[in-house]
Design a protein with these regions (language model features):
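Conserved ABC transporter NBD signature motif
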Residues: 57-65, 77, 111
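Helical segment within the ABC ATPase nucleotide-binding domain
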Residues: 170-184
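ABC ATPase C-loop
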Residues: 147-148
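The feature captures the beta-strand-to-loop junction immediately N-terminal to the Walker
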Residues: 31-36
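Helix-to-loop junction immediately C-terminal to a conserved catalytic motif
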Residues: 49
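Conserved catalytic motifs of ABC-family nucleotide-binding domains
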Residues: 151
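ABC-type ATPase nucleotide-binding domains, specifically the catalytic core motifs of the NBD
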Residues: 13, 94-111, 119-121, 214-216, ...
Length: 233
């Protein structure tokens, strides 16, 4: 088991958001978390990466208790994070953005420059272009590449389809499958786009009001109508 959350709660100030979350992710899996806006998906991802402290419970990564570890320590341990909204550095070039991701694993022989340009060739073509001038889909590719270049064991993606045209969403979903298949990278993502959930996830947790209410397996993931019920579509 590469990632475990046991009875994890978290929030902002005195406002609780996550309540007694239990999650299991095996190495090499692609696991989704689905739910409508406002159910706590982004809070979950910030808590997993360490940008937000868990107020209760335990987070275990690769067999180690990382509950008290900060985001930088978790990143060095092998977590890569792609936040909602991508958060690329708009005034820096594509290449400079990617080099920022390299600092997590500076000096390593395991950096994945060749691989990221294979997955996202448009980034190599536009290496000198300011990141802020890229399209939304290209910025998402850049955010993934920046997280991937340090060769993390786990990628955490927060709403990877948000604000991106459908054809590019499909392309990014295929790229994430290739990354998982070829590199063995474990992926945990949160999403409310049914197409992305069905395309990517091996299994999925359904989230409501800050906690998981069900685990969805392959049979339900293949049934679009059944899956839509979890999002009240």
């Amino acid at each position: 088991m590469i990632l475990e959350l046991d009875d994890v709660s978290a929030g902002y100030g005195t406002t609780p958001i996550l309540r007694d979350v239990n999650l299991r992710v095996e190495a090499g899996e692609i696991v989704g978390v689905m739910g409508k806006n406002g159910v706590g998906k982004t809070t979950l991802m910030k808590t997993v990466i360490g940008l937000l402290d868990a107020t209760e419970g335990t987070i275990t990564y690769a067999g180690e208790d990382v509950t008290a570890a900060g985001a930088d320590e978790r990143a060095r341990a092998g977590m890569g994070y792609i936040p909602q909204g991508r958060e690329v550095f708009p005034k820096l070039s594509v290449e400079q953005n990617i080099k920022i991701g390299e600092t997590v694993n500076a000096g390593s022989d395991d950096l994945l420059y060749d691989e990221i340009y294979d997955y996202f060739p448009i980034l190599q073509e536009r290496a000198d272009q300011q990141a802020g001038t890229l399209s939304g889909g290209q910025q998402q590719m850049l955010a993934i590449a920046r997280a991937l270049v340090s060769n993390p064991d786990v990628l955490l993606l927060d709403e990877p389809s948000e604000g991106i045209q459908p054809s590019i969403v499909d392309q990014i979903s295929r790229d994430m499958k290739r990354i998982n298949d070829q590199l063995g990278t474990t992926i945990l993502f949160v999403e409310q786009n049914l197409g992305v959930i069905r395309e990517l996830a091996d299994r999925c947790y359904a989230m409501e009001r800050g906690t998981f209410v069900d685990t969805v397996g392959p049979e339900t993931l293949a049934d679009e109508d059944a899956l839509a019920e979890y999002l009240a579509v």
